Amino acid sequence: FFYVGLDKPNLYTPKEIKNKKLEQFSSNELFSNEKLNSNNIIKDYKFTLVNIWSSWCVPCKNEHFLLMDLKEKTKLNIIGLNYKDKKNNAIKFINELGNPFSKILTDPDGTISISLGAYGVPETFLLNNKSKVIKKYIGPLTKENVKEIIKIVKS
């Protein structure tokens, strides 16, 4: 998977996914290797942003500063789902660019991302504390997307 159509405007929130509950998943945390359940890291926050990314994905690298900006400007719970990546490459990516994520879960074979309805990387879901999808962003986040997310989470 790779986001195709980088020259197209960011597409978001297909009607079939809005207000749909994101499927629960379990995976290992990138740094600690601890097995975590998605519901347990979402339920205690009013909003959670789940960002599917890879170290080899150029658009992921390009949007990363926006995730760092979101972390600084909000108390948003940001979860990274590392897609089809090598652990050492993912850790190097985070060490070089900073870590906007409260947790980074691994998806080494891509099955979790596919089960969530992702078409490629990057993709981002804004969820409420019941894991319902408020927004889905296909492709790299834009400054406008970040403004929209900030407006939603501060409302």
Indicate where each model-derived feature is located.
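Short pre-active-site segment immediately N-terminal to redox-active cysteine/selenocysteine motifs
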Residues: 46-48, 52-56, 120
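Thiol/disulfide oxidoreductase modules built on the thioredoxin-like
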Residues: 95-100, 107-154
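Short alpha-helical
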Residues: 58, 85-89, 111, 141-144
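A short beta-strand-turn-helix
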Residues: 25-48
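Conserved redox-active cysteine motifs that mediate thiol-disulfide chemistry
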Residues: 52-69
